[in-house]
Amino acid sequence: MRNGLPEFILSYINNRKQAKLDAFDKEAEKKRATLSGEALSVAELELAKARREIEQKHEVRNWLTDAASRAGQISLVTHALKFTHSDAKGSSVFNAETVEDATTLSTATLAQPAIDAVGNAAALDVAKLLQTEHDGDSLVAALQRGDNRALEALAENPEQLAQWLTGFQQVFTNRQPSSHKLAKQIYFPLANGEYHLLSPLYSSSLAHALHQRISAVRFGDEAKAIRQAQRTNQWHDQLSISYPNLAVQNMGGTKPQNISALNSSRSGRSYLLSSAPPQWNSIEKPPQQHESIFRPRGEVDYHTRATLAQMQRFLLSVKDVENNRDIRQQRLHYLDQLIDQLFFYVASVQNLPVGWSAESELKRAQQLWLDPYRAETDTVFRREREAGDWQQAVAYEFGRWLNRRLKHENLIFGEVERREWSTAALFKRRMREMESALKEELA
């Protein structure tokens, strides 16, 4: 055993305890503020008791005993079923075997595949304890090779150690494999009319390796230094790597932990590489000569013209039909297309040479949006950008633009519709994602 695992376990449990106590103390203060007199005295006794219970629960041996008892609620896997469908109840698979000289990219080509954990989301704290690396080792790796010294150093007696080992080793138990009606299934034909029924599983380990590689290229310190050198026309001794036309698949919605532990660590984000054939794209020119990209026959008009025409035709076709769920969904579909086309254009403009907006006629909010890297050298610009007020102005301009572009003698759009466009969920989400990525780069 490498040095430090017992200390890591102690630190892990203590950090969880402190987080629980901090949250408890914060809520307790709120409760005290609403009480006085006898009611406050009674509440103080109850609060003191509840706080002691948290401390007792997080006493190291108590916590490890509880964690060992909950370990059976999770499984360590490389291929997880719930990526296929969050309600699927079948088996996930652990297969970390590697293949040398492979001709295709797969989990087997990973030298050290990340091990995922699936099962009861309430027990993922146990998975994190087992999986977290400390000084090049982890508790799960130690247990796999039969090295029990980390737990032995913390156990009160051999009986308690045996109880912990029995509990934690449940994560390695091979349960009876089963599929589920929500799993993907493929009929693979054989001779004589027979077939194999295959159930492909999503490789969480491969997805995590891809996420780590791409995140390092997009947000790593070295990648930031390379991009800074590019923007200032300086030499750099490393290659500039990019993955164009990336797509992001969000797994698990607002509860990524219900899919798996690694999925939760990625906030549900999985990157998809583009498999589309290359296309010739003209280099975008900075919109310097006008006050808005939302002007008539402007840049946004050009990039969204086909979708705008389709949306207007659809709205005219259902003008006399009573509003229903299908109409609302189709209208939202067109709106989402427009938003994606807008942000695709914005992303291309943001990658133009830094500072182009300083000589432009653009409204200030659009300068702040479209030329974000100017904040690296312009302090006033940076402060305005960090204030964030410009985002509301941009959303307002987008809503006004869409009202104007959909206008027709048989279609009436007003403030209600403008507000709907400006506050669209996808618009907010794309803005949030774009700003989050930029914040990492500008940090």
Curated annotation (Swiss-Prot):
Belongs to the CRISPR-associated Csy1 family. CRISPR (clustered regularly interspaced short palindromic repeat) is an adaptive immune system that provides protection against mobile genetic elements (viruses, transposable elements and conjugative plasmids). CRISPR clusters contain sequences complementary to antecedent mobile elements and target invading nucleic acids. CRISPR clusters are transcribed and processed into CRISPR RNA (crRNA). It comes from Pectobacterium atrosepticum (strain SCRI 1043 / ATCC BAA-672). It comes from the Bacteria. This is CRISPR-associated protein Csy1. InterPro entries: CRISPR-assoc_prot_Csy1. Induction: Expressed in late exponential phase (other phases not tested); part of a large cas-CRISPR3 polycistronic operon. Keywords: Antiviral defense, Coiled coil. Residues 15-64 form a coiled coil. Interacts directly with Cys2; part of the probable Csy ribonucleoprotein complex with cys1, cys2, csy3, cas6f and crRNA. GO terms for biological process: defense response to virus. The gene is csy1. If the spacer DNA has a perfect match in the chromosome then toxicity results. Suppression of the toxic effects occurs via mutations in the CRISPR/Cas machinery, or via target deletion, which might contribute to genome plasticity. This CRISPR/Cas system can be used to remove genomic islands, and possibly other genomic regions.
